[in-house]
Amino acid sequence: MGNASLDIDHYQHIYTEYAPMLMRFAEKFVSGFFAEDIVHDVFLKLWDKQVFRLPESDLKRVLYVSVRNACLDYLRRMNME
């Protein structure tokens, strides 16, 4: 149980630290509401895959690449409609 609590605390720390930067990054691709939604989705996937356990430098790269790819996927879907 203690380990799960540490995981949640670490995840919350990562979210607090990176989410604002990632939302600004996503807004270069999509509007604010969609940027926020995309960043939240990326963090949910991060939790599911336990990616937050990566070293900080790798984690930052994974987060930015994941957000970029999610934005591009969203734009492709919107373009197809």
Predicted regions span which residues?
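Short alpha-helical functional segments enriched in proximate histidine and acidic residues
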Residues: 25, 45, 70, 74
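Short hydrophobic/aromatic segments of transmembrane alpha-helices and their interfaces
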Residues: 4-5, 18-19, 45
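Structural recognition of an alpha-helix C-terminal capping motif at a helix-to-coil junction
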Residues: 37-44, 48, 57-69
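Short, charged helix-capping/linker segments at alpha-helix termini
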Residues: 2-12, 23-41, 51-57
